[in-house]
């Protein structure tokens, strides 16, 4: 048989060979570092036997698929250790994930001390180096095997597999687990690992199921790489918006109010207000939008017309019972059906289009409680939502305009290089989820694809991520832990106008159906705030800071002058306060620095006599004395231009 390798070279063998044996034939060093293989594009164990002409790639830890095999094996070592220490624990699932692995167990919550004990047991397992064996069982035998081991979650997983599925197991010493693999040949290479956290996780991500205990870990081939990763994890914890946002008193959550319902405290609310006012002025004054204000709820009849009732009802908060109540209401998950009636309020001609509507909308989504997280996954949120009613011939220009507006906003926030673009398409194998036929989806997807290509925007395509009514551009960003969220969407909808009988009068006096573009300039303000907290580690650009200047009198004698300075700052629209406490000036400066304020103005006898202020900033440290008018002029220009100044180490 002929084996074609990744570098284009070929190896010829007279008999079947395992992937590991082929790796050894190529190089002993390659065999030592091998984690798995790819045969004709399929990732397999090193123990897999190749018996015919094939393309082969030997995967090491440097390959993504190699890392997955390495860390998946580590998750089994974790499970083996847990079962030794907690025999009553029930196994759920334990996949490899980006930068690590986790395993879910039905067991009591764990402490850091518990994780340390499990780590110690994992080291014992690795030292024992039990042989790893893969084998398969028929469906009924597999179910009986897991029932005998009293593993109900594994039984459920097997029962849910397709009838023709291959059911494989991995055995290492005294531990056996249901698993598709692939795994390492041996656990011996797993020497640099760490259990990083534990948390609750619902079985299969469904809040109606039992809460399990999830243990997270990471593993590397080299101790130095592990230490670097752990150092990085400590650093990103300092940026985690869910921790830092609370420390900075930007938001909080309260159990009695509920999950996914954060309270924006005065500082956080001020940042969001600044963002909202900026976006509203931008849309209204520079991009030709008209503003609407529509209800937070509507009768179910509206959502039946829009399609939400059939395609999105499970994600909505419904008020009332369809069977018993005469009128059933639902909180709005989006604003589009309301704005359609704003459009329909007066007849429009072809000259009136595009008709661009925008609203700062409060929306409600019935997210699973297991999905709730800080400000990024919430049940009530505010969004810069808008809908453009356009003629078909305006599609290209208006899609480009929406994309340019979104990119401009990202640029002002300084995050344009932190995003990726995705063309979210329908799933042709699950057509009941969507409106429209094959031709509709191919046409609309092509329209969006052409815009992205024409604008030179690098993008990926994702099947099954479209809205039920049309494809979209999703602008994606990752949080500090690498989880991707959608920040901004631009969606093309060529079907909904018929549902709402929307039309315009063309140049011949005939009625024509318009298209609709659903879009946001900023996306969800709460999610944007979370993103900015993590991007800037709480050190926001001055124009976004809820407190831009703090005036610090060096003693009570200069409190009146400090108040005069503060009054002048406020007159010029600067967000400023005075620290009139009797603390020492050094303490006040340190505290202001810890609170990440952009500017401190120190005032004492010299400043009072000359009408000046001593300026300290995050950007240049001690900037010396300045005339108050000059400082005000400079900071007002910085705020007006939304400048992002570089920080200096202090």
Language model segments and positions:
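NTP/phosphate- and nucleic-acid-binding module
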Residues: 1-73, 77-90, 97-650
